[in-house]
């Protein structure tokens, strides 16, 4: 099973930059999108062979997730947990026979870490949610998780220390998640690979210079580790400030 995750930074804009051609090229069983900034009624495009599920923020033109899938899920749910987490369209959970798929757009901690307190609450509650799902069947958790977990996961760790996405608190929460029975699929296959990034600032020619961050992930329940066929970052794909990440599972 081939799964793709991509923060498209506005799907309407990405549609004008080859999104449908990318979908044909990717030939994925499931495509998970973050930061769609689109409501379902605005989706005036054809994607034959895929069912489409949307979770939009209350605020127009903000956040949002989508799952496009060839296989009809057993169930689909939106958001999770407390009411505070249910207004920004950040999570879709699709249940398949072999696993739960959780597509997530994690809240950014913002400049001066002004939203860090909420981010910590989100991380704890989402980890509890994933662990609860994992008691029933394995979990595939993907998306823009807005954290570079280790120094190897960004080009300039020293100058970005305590910036949003590389604060001690954020990477500690990722460490805690992985210690709770989950595996970062890319690092499982490539523990020492450098220069592997999924997001680049639009400033300072960051993408040209590969001054990036790896903040987009596929994370799976530990018991799916032996099912991982490949985990890749398609850095050559443009259309957003992020690139797609890809997971192939033998399920």
Model-found features: residue ranges?
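Active-site beta-strand termini and strand-to-loop segments that position acidic
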Residues: 70, 94-97, 221-222, 247-251
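Active-site beta-strand/loop signature of hydrolases that rely on acidic residues for catalysis
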Residues: 7, 23-41, 101, 130-151, ...
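Surface-exposed cleft-lining segments at the edges of enzyme active sites
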Residues: 81-82, 107-123, 158-162
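Structured beta-strand-rich core segments of catalytic domains in phosphoester-bond hydrolases
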Residues: 37, 43-109
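Active-site-proximal beta-strand elements of phosphoester/diester hydrolases
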Residues: 1-9, 98-110, 142
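Conserved beta strand-loop-helix elements of the APE1-like EEP
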Residues: 60-75, 204-226
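N-terminal, active-site-proximal structural segment of metallo-dependent hydrolase catalytic domains
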Residues: 1-47, 51, 57-63, 78, ...
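Metal-dependent phosphoesterases centered on the DNase I-like endonuclease/exonuclease/phosphatase
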Residues: 30, 51, 122-211, 215
């Amino acid at each position: 099973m081939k799964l793709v995750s991509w923060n498209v930074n506005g799907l309407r804009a990405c549609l004008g930059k080859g999104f449908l051609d990318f979908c044909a090229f990717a030939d994925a069983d499931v495509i998970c999108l973050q930061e769609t900034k689109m409501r379902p009624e605005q989706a005036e495009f054809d994607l034959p062979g895929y069912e489409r599920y949307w979770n939009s923020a209350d605020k127009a033109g903000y956040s949002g997730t989508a799952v496009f899938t060839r296989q009809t899920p057993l169930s689909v749910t939106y958001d999770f947990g407390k009411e505070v987490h249910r207004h920004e369209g950040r999570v879709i959970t699709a249940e398949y026979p072999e696993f739960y798929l959780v597509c997530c757009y994690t809240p950014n901690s913002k400049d001066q870490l002004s939203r860090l307190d909420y981010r910590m609450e989100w991380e704890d509650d989402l980890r509890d949610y994933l662990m609860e799902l994992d008691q029933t069947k394995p979990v595939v958790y993907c998306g823009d998780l807005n954290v570079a977990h280790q120094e190897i996961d960004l080009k300039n760790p020293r100058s970005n220390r305590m910036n949003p996405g590389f604060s001690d608190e954020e990477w500690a929460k990722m460490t805690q998640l992985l210690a709770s029975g989950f595996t970062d699929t890319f690092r499982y296959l490539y523990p020492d690979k450098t220069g592997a990034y999924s997001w680049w600032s639009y400033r300072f020619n960051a993408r040209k210079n590969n001054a990036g961050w790896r903040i987009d992930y596929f994370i799976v329940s530990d018991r799916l580790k032996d099912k991982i066929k490949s985990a890749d970052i398609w850095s050559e794909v443009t259309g957003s400030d992020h690139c797609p990440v890809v997971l192939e599972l033998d399920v």
